Amino acid sequence: MIGKLSGRVDSSYDDYVIIDVSGVGYRVFASAKTLSKLSEGESYKLFIETHVREDHINLYGFLSLEEKSFFNLLQSVNGIGTRMALSILSALTPTDIQIAINNEDKNIFKAISGVGAKLAERIVRELSDKVAKISSSSAAIKDSLNIKGITPVASSEVIKALINMGFSRFEAQNAVQEIITKNPEISIDELIRTALKNRNSNF
């Protein structure tokens, strides 16, 4: 089995790239997020998940072991295969997925093409216990909310305030994490103002 490929992107297509490794071209399927980071002519290291079937051998590539882990985790849900797993990872990062599952936010998944209400419910239900077992950024999220005086209690209040101002819980948590990571010494008032400013600039 192939576990990793290091080579140059020879050509790219809608859902895969050809990786040239010492003159041999490997077709590697990947999420849209990963494909957007791969430039033709540049060299990369991709972690590979190999799927062997009677009629084909497919390689799936990831820039991080975390994304690869979530690719496999998603396929443990009844009704999700490799294509759907990549579609979900094309729309959401592993951190996004973990936050959505922890918050039982089915709407995040329902917004993805091909994911209906029943499948979204299964994702949240079937992965609620499993998602905590994967080494992801949950610890980083917790730490980022507990540095330089921004305590978990304070960050929770900020998140509640943002929700009252029209944010979804998912948006509020992501906004708080991103801002504190960039500016650990930010005050609570400035944190709220920055979150609102960033949100308005995205519309």
Curated annotation (Swiss-Prot):
Residues 143-149 are annotated as: Flexible linker. It comes from the Bacteria. Residues 64-142 are annotated as: Domain II. Residues 150-203 are annotated as: Domain III. One of its GO terms (cellular component) is Holliday junction helicase complex. NCBIfam families: ruvA. HAMAP family: DNA_HJ_migration_RuvA. Homotetramer. Forms an RuvA(8)-RuvB(12)-Holliday junction (HJ) complex. HJ DNA is sandwiched between 2 RuvA tetramers; dsDNA enters through RuvA and exits via RuvB. An RuvB hexamer assembles on each DNA strand where it exits the tetramer. Each RuvB hexamer is contacted by two RuvA subunits (via domain III) on 2 adjacent RuvB subunits; this complex drives branch migration. In the full resolvosome a probable DNA-RuvA(4)-RuvB(12)-RuvC(2) complex forms which resolves the HJ. Belongs to the RuvA family. This is Holliday junction branch migration complex subunit RuvA. It comes from Rickettsia bellii (strain OSU 85-389). The gene is ruvA.
